[in-house]
Amino acid sequence: LALTEAEAADRGIAAVLEAAVGRPLTWDQDDVALQNIQARVRGPSVWLLANLENALLLATSNRSEAAVGYATMDGDTCGGLSPIAGIDKSYLRHWLRWLEQHGPSGSHPIPALAAVNVQQPTAELRPPSEHQTDEADLMPYDVLEAVEDSAIRDKRVPLEVFLELSPRFPQVGAAQLAAWIERFFRLWCKNQWKRERFAPSFHVDDKNLDPRSWCRFPILSGGYERELAELRAHLARVAGP
């Protein structure tokens, strides 16, 4: 779809939904829903192209997005294989900078990647005036990867993750780090249903989030409520009266 056609489809779907719910959809009240409309509008066209070419559609999700469900089901998750879903976003960004500046042995760097690497990762689903970025929505990707390693690979509870990562990120305040850790655990629990439906990927390092081959987790759970309460209680004790 051309950009104008995609925008027209987005507006048309929004108008139908507004009539169904009996009120206007606004970014203040319906942020996630409006973002997801845009992501899903793209799905039919890419599936159509794959069908026309009798091709395997590749999905774009990486492991960091899978961990916290930062993807639109039936939107950017469309596909039959997800080539980079076995690596974290921070590793992917480091790798792209390495390709730009050095490149593999016997080959050459790819300076054109500078146009990609200079940009902040963004879903580009909110209005441009919002200057949306992934890290503002979630947390810095290097922190997210560290929390994921500690919580999922090493099977630590929130307080243990906090105690492990505090010395590694001294520039981050205790309250902020604890808030990011809580966000990770809540999003992890909330989005297991998405991981059950993501396209398969490759196991390339010491962990994988694919529930069919490595990381089982219940779709419905207690959400680490008791363990997160322990983290908040520890933070209150450290802060003092």
Which residue ranges define each predicted feature?
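ATP/NTP-dependent adenylation/nucleotidyl-transfer catalytic domains that generate, transfer
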Residues: L1-P241
